[in-house]
C-alpha cells in the first residue's frame, strides 16, 4: 500500500481507515490529485470551502498543508471517512481548528465560496448533495467534482444542470476528469424520504438517499429474514444495519431484547432510528450507533446475537476487510455461547473466515447465490 502522497509540491503520509487493510488499496486516488492540481494551477486562495465525500482526508489534509488556516467545512456520511481524515491530520501534524465537520443531513454554512467534491458511487445520494448545495450557494459559486473519466457522461452533466447549475468536464488526466459546475443560485427542494412496505412482516420502511437497497428488500436481507435463529435473546446487534430491517424483524421475534443498530453511514443509522419509531417499537429497546463496526460500542453491551449482512465495498474499492472486521468485533463482543448469524454471497467464502475465527461454522440455509452461516463463541 502506497502511503506517500506527493502532489503539486504537497507531501503527506496518508492511510486508509482502519490502517490495516489490503496492501493494494491506498487512501487517495488520481481524482484527488487532479482536484489538487486544478486548485494549485489556478492559483486558488483560501476562501470558505466545503469538502464533500473526501474518503480519508486527502483533500482536507492537502489544503491544510497549503494554508494552515484555510476554512474547511468537511461533509461526510461515513464514520470511517471522518475517523480516517482525523487520523491523517494528526499523523501529518496538521491543524484541525480550521475544520468544521458535517454529516450529510446537517445544514451547511451560508458563506461558502468554493466546493470540492468526489463523485460518490450512489448517484441518488449525489443528486441529494447537489440539491443541498443549491440551498446555500450563491450564484456564480464554483463547484469542482473529481471523478473517473468513465463515470462522466452527458446524463451526469444534466444532473448538475437540473439540481445546481451548468457544468462542463476537463480533459482527462490519469483516467480522471474534473467537472466544473457554476451554481445558478436557485434553491431546490430536498427529496422526500423513500418509503415502502414489507407486508408479510408488517413493516413500514423509509430510506434516506445514501442507504443501500433504497426502495426494496435486497435479496440477501430477504433470505436472512426467512431464516433468523430461534432463541430467547436479550441483547442483539444489527451490524451494518442499513435501514434496520433485520433489527426491526428481530424486535418482533424477540420482544424482550434490546436491539443495537450500528452502521458506518449516518444516513443508515438515521433511517433505522426513524423506522424503529414509525413501526411503533418501544423506544427504550432501540439503540443507535454511528460507528466503525463495534469499535465504540459501550463496554456494558454484551450481545448474545449479532446479525450481519456484510458489505464488500468501501466507496469505490472492493474489499473484504469490512466483513473481516465485523467478524472480529463479533467474536470480541459476543458473550460466551453467543451467536453470529450472517448472510453473504456464496463466492465470498465467509465460512473459511468464520471457521478460522470461531473454530466452528454451520450452514443454516442457502440458495444459488446466497448462504446463511452461523458461528458460536
UniProtKB/Swiss-Prot annotation:
Organism per entry: Shewanella sp. (strain MR-4)
What terms describe the molecular function in GO for this protein? 23S rRNA (guanine(1835)-N(2))-methyltransferase activity; nucleic acid binding
Keyword annotations of the record: Cytoplasm, Methyltransferase, rRNA processing, S-adenosyl-L-methionine, Transferase
What this protein is reported to do is described as: Specifically methylates the guanine in position 1835 (m2G1835) of 23S rRNA.
Q: Sorted alphabetically, which PANTHER family does this protein's record hold?
A: RIBOSOMAL RNA LARGE SUBUNIT METHYLTRANSFERASE G, RIBOSOMAL RNA SMALL SUBUNIT METHYLTRANSFERASE C
> Catalysed reaction per UniProt?
guanosine(1835) in 23S rRNA + S-adenosyl-L-methionine = N(2)-methylguanosine(1835) in 23S rRNA + S-adenosyl-L-homocysteine + H(+)
Subcellular location, record wording: Cytoplasm
- This chain belongs to which protein, by name? Ribosomal RNA large subunit methyltransferase G
**SUPFAM superfamilies noted in UniProt:** S-adenosyl-L-methionine-dependent methyltransferases
Q: Which gene encodes it?
A: rlmG
Name the enzyme group at the top EC level.
transferase
Which EC numbers does the record give?
Answer: 2.1.1.174
- One annotated Gene Ontology cellular component of this protein: cytoplasm
Task: Describe the family membership recorded for this protein in Swiss-Prot or TrEMBL.
Answer: Belongs to the methyltransferase superfamily. RlmG family.
Query: What Gene3D superfamilies is this protein classified in?
Result: Vaccinia Virus protein VP39
